[in-house]
């Protein structure tokens, strides 16, 4: 099948692999699937129907965590959709009503063109998704479970707290700064960031020590200082 393109490259991590694919993308839409996950047979059919019918730029489906056994999702199938305009969608991202992961969505190519993933980040999706949403005029969410996230004990998402997870806090901080042009959403993002700081600080006190703990404390202190002098 000449529609399939195989890229041979040195392993540069998840972001680098996604970026390599984006550099040769040729279709009207793009999606990202992690190699150990899988999708429902009709996921793309349903999402393409929804994105075209509603003239949307992004479509998001529901996902299910699984250890490898998938129950039939017939009882979960529904025609219900949620349609969000740009600012509604940005607020939904901050409130986690739109999940920051990239793999349960499809995107119009034009809105993510040149929007590459930051290399070397632990939570790369957190740095990327809000920017993609900000480029979209309309997002549609469907209620069907279409994506199956393979859950295993040694998954990077479920390992014990470590200093690399501080990337998630940095992503939330960058997101807050990015959203300053949307005053109402900015306030929500700022409050969320305070809670994120508290979470990471508590985790750090429990699991980190030495230079890692010092780094975390310094990061949280810098964010709090920035927030405290912000008059918005």
Indicate where each model-derived feature is located.
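Acidic donor-binding segment of Leloir-type glycosyltransferases
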Residues: 1-8, 52
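General small-molecule cofactor/ligand-binding pocket signal
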Residues: 7, 140-142, 188, 230
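Glycine-rich, basic loop-to-helix element that forms the pyrophosphate-binding segment
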Residues: 9-25
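Donor-binding/catalytic cores of nucleotide-activated saccharide
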Residues: 14-15, 35-140, 150-163
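Short aromatic/hydrophobic "clamp" motif used to bind/position activated sugar donors
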Residues: 30
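C-terminal, non-catalytic tails of nucleotide-sugar-dependent glycosyltransferases
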Residues: 170-189, 225-231
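Amphipathic alpha-helical repeat scaffolds of TPR domains
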Residues: 191-203
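Membrane-interface aromatic/basic loop that binds lipid-linked glycans or pyrophosphate carriers
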Residues: 207-232
């Amino acid at each position: 099948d000449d529609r399939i393109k195989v890229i041979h490259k040195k392993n540069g991590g998840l972001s680098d692999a996604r970026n390599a694919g984006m550099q040769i993308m040729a279709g009207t839409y793009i999606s990202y699937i992690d190699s150990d996950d899988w999708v429902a047979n009709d996921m793309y059919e349903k999402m393409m129907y929804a994105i075209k019918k509603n003239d949307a730029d992004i479509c998001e489906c529901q996902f299910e965590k699984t250890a490898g056994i998938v129950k039939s999702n017939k009882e979960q199938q529904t025609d219900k959709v949620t349609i969000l305009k740009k600012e509604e969608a940005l607020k939904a991202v901050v409130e986690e009503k739109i999940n920051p992961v990239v793999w349960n969505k499809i995107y119009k190519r034009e809105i993510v063109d040149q929007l590459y993933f930051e290399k070397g980040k632990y939570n790369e999706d957190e740095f990327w998704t809000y920017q993609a949403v900000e480029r979209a005029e309309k997002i549609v969410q469907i209620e069907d479970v279409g994506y199956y996230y393979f859950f295993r004990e040694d998954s990077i998402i479920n390992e014990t707290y470590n200093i690399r997870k501080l990337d998630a806090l940095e992503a939330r901080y960058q997101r807050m700064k990015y959203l300053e042009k949307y005053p109402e959403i900015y306030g929500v993002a700022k409050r969320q960031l305070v809670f994120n700081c508290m979470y990471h600080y508590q985790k750090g006190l429990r699991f980190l020590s030495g230079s890692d703990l010092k780094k975390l404390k310094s990061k949280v202190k810098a964010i709090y200082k920035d927030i405290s002098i912000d008059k918005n």
